[in-house]
């Protein structure tokens, strides 16, 4: 289990992480989402002891990362696949980690097989690896000690579609075996497919968290009309709360906190023709993400 409590990080007058609290539970994949610069990577670095917190705490299985006697046996970490030693071979990197953890030598070959790095690829220096190969090596290193917790920042970067599916299945199986998986990714569809729980961060603060089903169900109704301003007025008169929807860059859509039947009734009574009317949960994670983080987005940034 990962427990983050009232976590904050300040750099001078800039607050990168602001009173963040959430829990990632065993047997579940937790998707950690937010726009670029939202504080995801800083939070993860604090979790694994690479960045000191200004206040608050981040614990793995009830202890700080720095207090774990042999961290690799309890927490598998992949924050930056490009940070591996470029002058070593893939096998050498895994062998160093295997010896530091006190594991049998056979674990190196087991992990190379698991991530589909061939003997030839394992013998190459990392400087000659593609980003996808570095990601596979990083995942192998994270899984080497068979830890009960995984903390992965953008592990799908550089993987082709087949590689992304492989990673998704691997992490799903790992969580189903009882492990805690915390996963950050800008590939919202992949998070939607694999995640059980979601934590959404914007400008260093948590803007939403809960199970994926809960958050998507709370999306309400998506409605589109050329007369969006007239519909907004009718909804206001009816006492229904709504917000502009940013789905697919739309400017004629609203998300209404009511069921589709009621929204359709209001539109009909006002004589307003609708282009689209459906439960917003059908819009999926991208719709929810864009709406929750609308005030924290940089132009063109997805996560």
Predicted regions and their residues:
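Conserved beta-strand edge residues that scaffold enzyme active sites
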Residues: 126, 188, 249, 281-282
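ABC transporter nucleotide-binding domains
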Residues: 2-183, 188-189, 193-202
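ABC transporter nucleotide-binding domain
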Residues: 167-257
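C-terminal coupling/interaction segments
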Residues: 255-303
